[in-house]
Amino acid sequence: MTLRHGREFLAIPGPTTVPDEVLQAMHRPAIEIYAGALLDTTYSCLDDLRRIFRTEGRTYIYAANGHGAWEAALSNTLSRGDRVLVLGSGLFAPAWGEMAASQGIVVEEMPASYRHPVDPAAVEARLRADTAGEIRAVLVVQVDTASSIVNDIPAIRRAIDAAGHGALFMVDAIASLATMPFEMDGWGIDVGVTGSQKGLMTPPGLSFVAAGKRALAAHETADLRTFYWDWTQREGPRHYNKYCGTPPEHLLFGLRKALDLLFEEGLPAVFERHRILAEATRRAVAVWAEGGVLSFNVLVPEARANSVTTLRLEGHDPAALLRYAEEVCGVVLGIGIGDLTDKAFRIAHMGHVNAPMMLGTLGVVETSLAALGIPHGKGGVQAAIDCFVESVPDSGGKDSAGGGSPAAARAAAPAVNAPGE
């Protein structure tokens, strides 16, 4: 006997649940790729990605996952023998560094932890010591989905500036964009990368790079450029150049709808929704942790991400809990990865997710803990409910931060004065 019959819920940190409206937008025939409506879709997506990244720079769409965006960022701005400084806080910045090393880039990793965020003071000290200016770029992730750490990107930018260093600042926003503020121009970020399958609520298969003025200048002398990733090729005169071939039409249809949904809700409301859902999850975890077995992976409360929470489980097999949650209850939780393989599990609260979805997920986690006899404090779900009650008092109607047509919402969004296509 199981309780899983019905719609399975995906509570992993990517891919995330795809809204029905996005799926419906994709359910259509292929169309002409050289003229007509698809060109409007491409150019509107490129422009709205600038709004999401908050940049006046250029944006590029790749038929690739986030690792493709990593390679595009590196190959378009750096040359063989260049040195980069990798700021680890989990699995993914070091993995980006491994990719850089495979391209002939010299990689230096700062001492890092899965439990603490990047230390801006240490970054400043290392860059001050680089008096010859050998470090050409600093690589960091805003949110690492393995550890669930959120790094303070503005503070790292201030550290770079305090050191008087000219390195490019490259930020992976794959697990953060459209879940929390990301101010590319305001924070002095030179390159931002993300993927379609997390906060952007689109199926996997697209990745995006945003390039600022300094990155575009570095592109002119980069010798790692290859035909597919090359920004110069992507700026060619034909629509075909935007994708270096046939456009991924149906993913673009889905992306267009997902962007409409984000602007319709309003980005401030999107960020606040993620913050409240994350806080409710953390309230539940704090109660469960009273059992002495389950604990937050991230030891610094303010460095706990609003898109995913990683939980350590001491003395018990996380796989058993994940198996019960999926096979009995129909909720798929995230496995521990990297250094947390077989030691942790992850609860996602990103993208197309709301209060009943989170309460269902948290209820299944608490049910699984009880069913498997894993010691835990009682009342975690109630703590999450209390958080919702405190955070969202009855307003008597629809939240004023959202609503309206997608076109009107885009028009009301802060303009970025992006260059035309």
Feature-to-residue mapping (PLM):
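PLP-dependent enzyme catalytic core of the Aspartate aminotransferase-like
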Residues: 2, 339, 343-421
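Active-site C-terminal subdomain of aminotransferase-like
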Residues: 17-18, 197-284
